[in-house]
Amino acid sequence: MTRKQKRLAVIAGGVGFIMVAVLLVLFAFGQSIAYFYMPSDLAKTPVGPGTRIRLGGLVAEGSVKRDTGSTVSFAVTDGTATVPVTYTGILPDLFREGQGVVTEGVFGAGGTLFDADTVLAKHDENYMPKEVADRMKKDGVWKGEGEAK
C-alpha cells in the first residue's frame, strides 16, 4: 500500500467512526426527548399510546380525586381542552387545583388517559412554568397577572 492509499484509508476510517458516533448520539437523544404539549394541541393532533410527552397546563378545578393508595386522578386544562391524568406517587407540596403543572408520561392503550410518572408544580403564587404561560398567551387564554417568570 502506498502512502497515499494509507492516508485515504485512515481518513475513511475516521469519517466512518465519526458517522457511527453521531448516529448513536442521535438515537440516544431520540429515545429520551419528551415533546411538550398543551391539552388543546392534543385535541388537534393526538399522539399515539406509549409516546412519551410532557403535558402542561392548569390543574382543572374540582378534578383532583385521591384513591385509597397513592394514586391521584386529576385533569390538566389550558382553558380550551382538558386531558385526564393519573399519577401514582407523592405529589409536590404545592400541587393544587387551579395552579400550573407540567406532567411527564405516556398515554395508555386507549389513548385518552395520560399516565404521568413525573409531576412538577409551580413554585409560588406568581409562578407558572414559562412554556405553559407562553403557550396560553399565544392561544389567547392567559388569565394571569403580569409576565411568567
Curated annotation (Swiss-Prot):
InterPro entries: CcmE (IPR004329), CcmE-like_sf (IPR036127), NA-bd_OB-fold (IPR012340). Disulfide bonds: none annotated. GO terms for cellular component: plasma membrane. SUPFAM superfamilies: Heme chaperone CcmE. It holds the Pfam family CcmE. It is a single-pass type II membrane protein. The keyword NADP does not apply. One of its GO terms (biological process) is cytochrome complex assembly. Heme binds at residues 123, 127. Residues 29-149 are periplasmic. Keywords: Cell inner membrane, Cell membrane, Cytochrome c-type biogenesis, Heme, Iron, Membrane, Metal-binding, Signal-anchor, Transmembrane, Transmembrane helix. GO terms for molecular function: heme binding; metal ion binding. The chain crosses the membrane at residues 8-28. Residues 1-7 are cytoplasmic. It comes from the Bacteria. Heme chaperone required for the biogenesis of c-type cytochromes. Transiently binds heme delivered by CcmC and transfers the heme to apo-cytochromes in a process facilitated by CcmF and CcmH. Belongs to the CcmE/CycJ family. This is Cytochrome c-type biogenesis protein CcmE. It comes from Allorhizobium ampelinum (strain ATCC BAA-846 / DSM 112012 / S4). The gene is ccmE.
